[in-house]
């Protein structure tokens, strides 16, 4: 067997391979014999079919499989088992010239890790949200919890207000005949009138109505409520751009009866952990602060990645890009019960998501370079801390039980280690970047300006 390794691009190599028919013959004969053991041909005992007949019937397909396997083994021997080159992603067979009982000529292309020279980051600015929890934040959260615990009391005579719950039936009406359209009716729909996803036309029509009222209203031809109502409209109509006429029957109106803010309420929402109002407020403040800190870090991490990609435009091997695109397609499958949707255009999907795949591949290369240069590692103590945080100190599920669950799935354990490693990379970058802290008000104003600028650029784009 003759092999030649050549550089095809700054991040790709090609392995050219030539093998004679004599070199392939032992593997081909072995594959033919394996096929013969399972063959059941009339006139011959099972497993006793002449090898020549096996070859005549299946030789071409078997030969191709043998050739592919031979090329893969050559790649492992010539590339993977040496320290000269570190391949990235899966190799691609770009050429295979082979006929049964003839020589084999093949070319494999594979990606390699490019050199990444990290730039000086001391003058690179990023914005970090510095969230300060106010008393208003605490009171808003308490009010939210009270609303969650509230009882819904039916109103007999009072009209619906914009913070009430209304249950209705919707019957579409034919405007030409002024009669109900049979089969076009939705029943038992419940809406919270202060839900910003609710169609404004329906909200305005329902405010002021009472249980037992019936009225008509024109609504947009799409579902007249909102997509998260819990009931999808069962009928599809040809879109004509016109509103549709509905008769609305109000079944009931309910209003929230907020529980008093007392020790009993505190015990209920904390499941008995607290019973003191002041301690309850302090606990809420700490939880809000923790949640906002986490959100601030996540937003800053996104900005860090954008800055690092901008500063380090390293080339990404095609095999790495394709690997990420494969994972995107796999995610679509998992979101659809293990199958791609019937109308899924994979080629268009891959083209549309190619930039994201390339960016993820580039960030992976930059991140790995930081890990190598800084000798970042994940200790067993850090893994144990992760599981302890996941358990949250709960008695029902201990850190040890969570760890045992993860250990049954090596891929999950690998994700845990990579998550911890990524946190260390971000810590390293935050220490070296010029981080400017901003209040929530300043941060939201800046984000709004950026969104407006982005929208303006999109409008000006050809």
Swiss-Prot record:
EC number from the UniProt entry: 5.2.1.8
InterPro entries named among the record's database cross-references: PPIase_dom_sf, Trig_fac, Trigger_fac_C, Trigger_fac_C_sf, Trigger_fac_ribosome-bd_bac, Trigger_fac_ribosome-bd_sf, Trigger_fact/SurA_dom_sf
Keyword terms, alphabetized: Cell cycle, Cell division, Chaperone, Cytoplasm, Isomerase, Rotamase
A cellular component annotation (GO) from this entry: cytoplasm
Location(s) in or outside the cell: Cytoplasm
Catalytic activity as recorded in UniProt: [protein]-peptidylproline (omega=180) = [protein]-peptidylproline (omega=0)
Amino acid composition bias (Low complexity), ranges on this chain: 448-462
Swiss-Prot/TrEMBL GO biological process terms: cell division; protein folding; protein transport
Biological role: Involved in protein export. Acts as a chaperone by maintaining the newly synthesized protein in an open conformation. Functions as a peptidyl-prolyl cis-trans isomerase.
Domain notes: Consists of 3 domains; the N-terminus binds the ribosome, the middle domain has PPIase activity, while the C-terminus has intrinsic chaperone activity on its own.
Protein family according to the UniProt entry: Belongs to the FKBP-type PPIase family. Tig subfamily.
NCBIfam families associated with the record: tig (TIGR00115)
UniProt protein name: Trigger factor
Organism: Salinibacter ruber (strain DSM 13855 / M31)
Native organism taxonomy: Bacteria, Pseudomonadati, Rhodothermota, Rhodothermia, Rhodothermales
Gene: tig
